[in-house]
């Protein structure tokens, strides 16, 4: 079953990429294979990120996804078969409990975890605040973290758009970060270190440990998953509070043909 699943993941990645016309320009590809199992953390801009990560990791993976993805045609069942854990982002404590089987999968089955520490797609190219869930898993499993920095997947499928467009996405796979000496006591420092590695690679200003810890609290209310969920149920539009951030949203390429996979 495991070999069949690995084959299905690779086949899906290759077939979907060919249909879309998606090419990957990857620097540091060797870091994908130097240490397994690992926790592959990626910054989340687009629905295309799932396809990108499947194309890169290819085998023996488990993942975390928002509960809403479970009901998507094609992608939802495939993610479920691949062992993706679907979480309710509005219930923090339940989400933490749901992630516990991931540690067992990594330790006993030697599978790698694929996770977006931002917890949701960023509405702009600016890196969002990091949640601690993946870092707690790293502490419990003692497996290394491999940062996967995706630069422009929003060009392929901007947030809010179900159409995938052809193009080249640039990716940096950074060297593995060991976690064997990590503890809950220094988790804020570790989150800041990993997030700053992303910021450096993206060409964005780094933050101190204190600034990183404050970033989640300072996230505009209408960008927080739990608030977005309440607004959606009420029929209200979700948008960034700061209008200046809207200018950095990757533009939709009008008139270019695309394909809908969702």
Q: Where do the protein language model's features map onto the residues?
A:
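Membrane-proximal helical "anchor" segments flanking the first transmembrane region
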Residues: 1-39, 238, 245, 253-262
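Catalytic core of membrane glycerolipid acyltransferases/transacylases, capturing the structured
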Residues: 3-11, 17-21, 34-92
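A generic structural signal for well-ordered alpha-helical segments
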Residues: 16-17, 79, 106, 138
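A generic local structural motif
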Residues: 24-28, 48-50, 99-101, 157-159
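Generic preference for hydrophobic
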Residues: 26, 40, 63, 171-173
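Thr-Gly-centered strand-to-loop micro-motif
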Residues: 27, 64-66, 88-89, 117, ...
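Non-catalytic C-terminal accessory region of glycerolipid acyltransferases
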Residues: 96-262
């Amino acid at each position: 079953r495991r070999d069949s699943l690995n084959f299905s993941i690779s086949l899906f990645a290759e077939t979907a990429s060919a249909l879309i016309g998606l090419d990957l320009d990857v620097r540091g590809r060797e870091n994908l294979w130097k240490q397994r199992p690992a926790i592959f953390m990626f910054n989340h801009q687009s629905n295309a990120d799932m396809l990108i990560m499947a194309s890169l990791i290819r085998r023996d993976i488990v993942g975390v996804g928002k509960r809403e993805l479970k009901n998507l045609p094609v992608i939802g069942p495939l993610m479920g078969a691949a062992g993706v854990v679907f979480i309710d982002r509005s219930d923090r404590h339940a989400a933490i409990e749901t992630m516990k089987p991931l540690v067992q999968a990594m330790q006993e089955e030697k599978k790698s975890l694929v996770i977006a520490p931002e917890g949701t797609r960023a509405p702009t190219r600016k890196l969002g605040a990091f949640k601690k869930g993946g870092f707690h898993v790293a502490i419990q499993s003692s497996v290394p973290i491999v940062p996967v920095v995706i630069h422009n997947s929003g060009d392929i499928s901007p947030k809010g758009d179900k159409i995938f467009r052809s193009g080249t996405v640039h990716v940096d796979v950074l060297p593995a970060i060991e976690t064997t000496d990590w503890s809950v006591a220094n988790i804020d420092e570790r989150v800041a270190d990993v997030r700053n590695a992303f910021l450096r690679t993206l060409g964005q200003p780094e933050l101190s440990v204190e600034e990183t810890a404050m970033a989640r609290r300072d996230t505009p209310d209408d960008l927080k998953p739990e608030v977005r969920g309440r607004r959606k149920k009420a029929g209200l539009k979700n948008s960034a509070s700061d209008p200046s951030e809207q200018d950095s949203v990757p533009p939709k390429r009008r008139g270019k043909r695309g394909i809908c996979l969702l």
